[in-house]
């Protein structure tokens, strides 16, 4: 490192230390201010002596729930409950009471309150507001789909009673392909328009999902806490703070204003049990809010494997037979408690949370089903604390502020302590190497404490123009040790990322034209202390601290020609910094690679969409999108030459182009038919090998990647079945098709001898019934209805036909 580099690094360190000190002082002042505000609020509440209560109704007589009844000039306010009733506690005196609700004229009434008093209000419809509401009253998912970004938006409410997890729900979405291994709790690979794995980032309420802890993914997040899912394709908005190459998935949790309890229990094939509980209690007068959630899942995962080769002693040859998995148990426990203040004048939400997760999994196979484990296990444990603050009109009008801080203690233990080689019968022979690592016995501990800070500021200049600034810090340590393997060298590495995004949004011509332009800055700092296996990991070249800095940018635009036709296009030069698993390995089966470079891609989308109203109760919705992805320094998992383990490397570039489309037909709220299809042309862009020789796989299709796939969904719904109010019967059927594809490079060997994964046809069906206005619900589901043999990553078999049932109780009247 040059003296100039040393000087710049020293200046950077001094600046960073000053920034940290300043940040700590600001935080101290902020905490003191928040405590004072809370104290003042408590004092106001403690001095309240009288109660003002009553009801809010429309002039036609119907009750109005969620109307805001507030005291002008104070922070006092309450929302009406489902019966339209409200309660306010206050000191005796004269007040101006304000009653407001979308679609109705605001009421202002001057009243005198000397003792407990009942005051009822009747609201008059506002024709102008109602007309505007018809235009703007679309669901958030629909408005998002009509933005400048290419995005799938999925409302979870119609699917809340389903036994499906998020993987299954997202996997049916347009342009998405999810491939799972080993049943419940198995690893999975999600592809968005061809780019998959770590090229896709996951968020929950705009916060990286990794903050939840090791082992937490789409498959084990309970659906009853989720409102909707946003899937961004290729171009990701700067407000997410994502270094995503192929896209991002943002899970939006429920933000209910009502109190509720939501509990469910499900049981199914292969010894599967799943229980979820979530709830919320908010005291309207003080704004104190408590939100607990708990989730438990267990599965034996002992489904049948078909056509497995085993050694037959009598015939002295390998024969094919069907056998059950026997070392594939999965158990997960997740719990979270969130508490704080909501809906006050000084904050929309100030919430503190603590969460815990534990995931224990037996390992049955390696990367392919020819490698069988019989004793190896993996356990992940995490504990997280966090704080979140949100306020509209923060300090000035039209400035919305979101601040989030969290710290997560994550640990993973991989146990690999037997010198055995197993087969599918459960038999084993003694060997001179462990099952996973192929070296000595080990119990590998990896601790990765993670700190995340996010600040998002959104300023609306007016209804047509807004600016958003987003800052995201993630700082992770890598503390690894092995008390069993005496040759393993412990170390403590560190990896930090700063991502700053700035975006400008226009909404012109009464919403017909929408533009978004953005720029992102990616800064990373890697500190390497480990020195073992330096000839594999490159640690000798990266010892000490190294930094990188990259710029990304993009824009998107949408123009609505008519209700039946809108056009949108978006582009991003995206940058993805290596993830901790890629840089630091996983402590057992994946080696570190400290020489990894950030990957980049130029992503382009051009799409059409629209709504066609066929008749009074018939509607047709369509969407089609053409996309191009040109990725450089593409990070890909490859087999390491030494000891046969894996390692991530910048080994290739990838060129992808394709087209996708979706068509939806709705008949009132009774029938919905949805069909989508995707075609990918994903090819290697690497022309030459490292030694300069031509690469035989140049312009070959990428191996082990589906390139044609489609989904069809049929949903029938009947409300007030047999004239009984508050009931709902729902039937769903979905069909998935995956075209055959090569398991290995198509440029290797003769066509007839190549391994292929055959075309697959998968059917699922479900039935749910709810009564008492959705309070009680029961669901039944059959997956892989026709019991077909289904494959996924590297031809690993998935479960055959299986059955599941689920009971759910939802209470929001208390």
Language model features with spans:
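Short, acidic, small-residue-rich periplasmic hinge/interaction motif at the N-terminus
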Residues: 57-59, 68-72, 100-104, 114-158
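Short acidic/polar hinge/loop motifs at secondary-structure boundaries
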Residues: 87-89, 207-234
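N-terminal periplasmic accessory domains that precede
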Residues: 117-122, 132, 166-169, 186-191, ...
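Extracytoplasmic beta-strand/coil segments of soluble accessory domains associated
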Residues: 167-208
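Periplasmic-side early beta-strands and strand-to-turn transitions of outer-membrane beta-barrels
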Residues: 266, 285-369
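Face-selective signature of the C-terminal outer-membrane beta-barrel domain
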Residues: 337-359, 378-538, 542-554, 558-563, ...
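Membrane-embedded beta-barrel scaffold of Gram-negative outer-membrane proteins
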Residues: 560, 568-572, 599-657, 678, ...
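Gram-negative outer-membrane beta-barrel transporters
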Residues: 621, 625-630, 649-742
